[in-house]
Amino acid sequence: MLEKVLKRKNALRAKRKLRVRGKIFGTAQKPRVSLFRSNRYLYAQAINDESGLTLASVDGKKLGLGNNKEEAKKIAASFAASLQEAGIKEVVFDRNGYLYHGVVASFADSLRENGIGL
């Protein structure tokens, strides 16, 4: 029973991911911020889809921060600093199929608070 529920949950996330990725595209001036949420950590990277390059990234594991709302704010603050260092002020947010709720929403709100336009 649990396997069936998890398969359905993952399939729905994959559908959402494809639907969202079909509509957004990152450029050098306005890169795509892709967020990945594991069970323990949070990862984000700014991607220029035109050239396929990662412009900036942050790793919650390397920062010693986990995967909850308060730590997502700290990770986003660190990421915003690296984006500003690279001269990026505007981004396109790719929630990567995750619902815009909890950790994902907290990360996005913290990016906005730190001066990055979404």
Curated annotation (Swiss-Prot):
**Alphabetical GO biological process terms:** translation
Q: Does the keyword rRNA-binding apply?
A: yes
Q: Which GO terms describe its cellular component?
A: cytosolic large ribosomal subunit
Q: List the disulfide bonds.
A: none
Q: Name one GO molecular function term.
A: structural constituent of ribosome
List the Pfam families hit by this protein, alphabetically.
Ribosomal_L18p
User: Where along the sequence do coiled-coil regions lie?
Assistant: none
Q: Cite the entry's keywords alphabetically.
A: Ribonucleoprotein, Ribosomal protein, RNA-binding, rRNA-binding
User: What does the record note on quaternary structure?
Assistant: Part of the 50S ribosomal subunit; part of the 5S rRNA/L5/L18/L25 subcomplex. Contacts the 5S and 23S rRNAs.
Q: Which family does it belong to?
A: Belongs to the universal ribosomal protein uL18 family.
This chain's function reads: This is one of the proteins that bind and probably mediate the attachment of the 5S RNA into the large ribosomal subunit, where it forms part of the central protuberance.
Q: What is this protein called?
A: Large ribosomal subunit protein uL18
Taxonomic lineage: Bacteria, Pseudomonadati, Campylobacterota, Epsilonproteobacteria, Campylobacterales
